[in-house]
Amino acid sequence: MKVISGKYKGRKLDGFDIDGTRPTMDRVKESLFAIIQNYISESIVLDLFAGSGNLGIEALSEGAKYAYLVDKNIKCIKTIKKNVNNIGIENVKIIHNDYRKVLKDINKKFDLIFLDPPYKTNCIEESIKLIDEYNLLNDNGIIVCESDNLDKIVYTDKFSAIRDRHYGDKYIVLLKKI
């Protein structure tokens, strides 16, 4: 895994082998970031199930102002810290906690939110409900959902899907406030 473009282009990212997780592959990440490019510059990013920090770090490389990288797994947090330190990124906050607690307590608004939980979970629907309940998405912001099953990407009537893509065993849906 590596950073595919921007100021950190070509920098290697460490991954990990934790059951139920799988990082977004470089070719899928490249396609995704081509789609969301107009939302990245100067954005405040929340990568809620950050894993290795892959998506949040890519957003920072492509011009995001600040990123919050969240994961509840300590192995993921250690990997994120290693990746951030190896690249020398400073405009990032790494949070080791459960997504529900983070969404309740963070009290920020985001321009770009990544929801890429482990495939064996059903966290997307609850995450979207909490993002809406706590009003965490800026009016022009987007939520990027990734899952192995399109049926797991369930959202309230306050959001609409503006784009969806299928890449092998991955479904990516972009949501925007209505």
Where are these regions (language model features)?
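Class I S-adenosyl-L-methionine-dependent methyltransferase catalytic core
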Residues: 1-178
